[in-house]
A protein has these predicted regions:
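Short, surface-exposed beta-strand/loop micro-motifs that present aromatic residues
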Residues: 60-64
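Basic/polar, cationic surfaces and motifs that engage anionic cell-wall
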Residues: 1-12, 45-49, 65-68, 75-133
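Short, conserved "active-site rim" segments that organize catalytic pockets and cofactor/ligand binding
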Residues: 1-57
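Residues embedded in well-ordered beta-strands
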Residues: 40, 71-73
């Protein structure tokens, strides 16, 4: 079992109101020469949680933090103009994210929760993780 110290929240950087799947993200990541989808979990707009990369395998979602973190991605994070960062989470996604983080913190009690933007000069996940989770 990997020693998990961080749970890192991401957005897919896709426009609000549009549905994408784990397979879509996997295809994008494979095209970028990743070994697999970079995230461990993906939360769809309807609030359903889907597994990506297995938890026992390091992700590919946050440079310098992959070895000891779990990556969660929600579908959305960009306005309809496809450029402007925006918190596009549906109420179902917000609830699912809170529940998933709670479950992971039970399994990894010493893990801290962060937004990708805390480690990289990015807007991702397009909301302030520290004030919401």
């Amino acid at each position: 079992m990997r020693h998990i110290t961080e749970i890192i929240i991401h957005c897919s950087a896709t426009p609000e109101g549009k549905d994408f799947t784990v397979e879509d993200i996997r295809r994008w990541h494979l095209a970028r020469k990743f070994a697999d989808i970079g995230y461990h979990y993906v939360i769809y707009r309807d609030g359903s949680v889907h597994k990506g990369r297995a938890e026992n395998i390091a992700g590919a979602h946050c440079l310098g933090h992959n070895a000891h973190s779990i990556g969660i991605c929600y579908i959305g994070g960009v306005a309809k103009d496809e450029k402007t960062p925006k918190d596009t989470r549906t109420p179902q996604q917000k609830q699912a994210l809170r529940q998933l983080v709670q479950q992971l913190q039970f399994v990894y009690p010493h893990a801290t929760v962060h937004g990708h933007n805390e480690f990289s000069c990015k807007a991702c996940p397009s909301f302030n993780v520290q004030t919401e989770l």
